[in-house]
């Protein structure tokens, strides 16, 4: 039996790993990098470029360079998130023949799994070059919040790439698996906070040691499949576009070439601001008009970036709250917080997570590689090479069917450990009803129409009988990959019908020495620059917090106070754009002085408020009879498929 590789098929970057001699090895690609950009490009000569080579030519070939395709996988064209993405990417998103969101490049319409397959082929080739033997089996990870269609489409991508996908596992579970191999003895409850390029999810995982074996159980999971580093980049891009428009009067939104350069610059600036207080985005010849070429040069502070993305970071907290509630665990009971995904390197994200969970997150797990490493461990478990790990994953959303009155009746509740099988008996709504439609749904809403439809099928030839007499057994079976199989059987005749829910679908010594000499010669200049950057940062942060305070205060701020604060804010904003640290300090002092009375009012009010305690209401346990008179809608003759 060949090796089973572990692949993290990411929105922004992908990674491949293998378990060798008991150690997990992340495999470098042909370019020597441990991660590969999840980018596929179609060149004019018909060549397909994948990874870094595709990313390099993106500026000159924006319409045929496909990135972040994972955000489209297993999605319908009409979905709001797809329509939103159409406005944001330079390539074309089109409606496939089956109603799915497809992409257009190189003169062809292609399904997202075809594009993802090109990335998987690159991962497969990377592993084969390292191992010196063919690789045909893999474990591929997906966001925990991926629905059934998205999981199936990911499996399809593996098949297109020539891989037998042995298991689809959740990214946070994989990360915990990578972390758990060398963990301390005893039981642990871990939060995996995974903020990647295009998706966010959070999982509460219990790692129990049972007779020397490590048992990983996902207690709860939650997230947002359309929130990630790409959204942070877009905020920065929008800001740069607005700043350029203010300065030159030209809108770069309709220039794909300019947008592609802006995307690269924004990503670079965002990464730099995780380790520095300010950076410059300098793009010469970004565009041109009748007067000649135009150049973009914008200085961005860390505080400015944080103000642009603050709401995105806050959006990650509600899923954390829900996951803890679903798991029935208090934040104080969490032993470790693991950060996964490149976007978690942002200081604001780390601070927000630490504030919410009341503890610093661990930094000993590489956020870019942990998921692929976990997938490789799971591959070794399946191959029988690792025997002391048991993985218990969960279904992320409730699954059920539509019953009379447009109600969704749940068969498998969310956060149920998989694989699982559940049956329930239903009956007919009308006398002599000859057929029923089984409408399979996924979601948390009681109203069927507000949940995601996974598919429909009919069970016909039911013998005539009064309503409520026929017994129709509906069975939901989720396999270890999270793929759903649904069956319906008339218990009287034994007639059955079933459906598998599918997706429609480093520096040299010389350079270091030169830098040291330069730094010594320019130490004074560097010190002044650092002080100026810190002052600008403080100014930007004060502007943002003051404006937020005024909004929060509402009518507690008088018109005179508001006018004085706004004037001081405008003066500080002007000073921050200059190079005079003393002027910035003076304006900071001025704004602090005029806003102090409002801040005191707010503080006094908050102190007066008493913290409110809440009691949890216990839900009475519902009793289920063997037969649920849920009553299907009748299938009319012309409705049958």
UniProtKB/Swiss-Prot annotation:
Induction: By stress conditions e.g. heat shock. It comes from the Bacteria. Pfam families: HSP70 (PF00012). GO terms for molecular function: ATP binding; ATP-dependent protein folding chaperone; unfolded protein binding. InterPro entries: ATPase_NBD, Chaperone_DnaK, Heat_shock_70_CS, HSP70_C_sf, HSP70_peptide-bd_sf, Hsp_70_fam. Residues 602-641 are annotated as: Disordered. Keywords: ATP-binding, Chaperone, Nucleotide-binding, Phosphoprotein, Stress response. Residues 604-619 have a biased composition (Low complexity). The modification Phosphothreonine is found at residue 199. Residues 620-641 have a biased composition (Basic and acidic residues). Belongs to the heat shock protein 70 family. Acts as a chaperone. This is Chaperone protein DnaK. It comes from Pseudomonas putida (strain GB-1). The gene is dnaK.
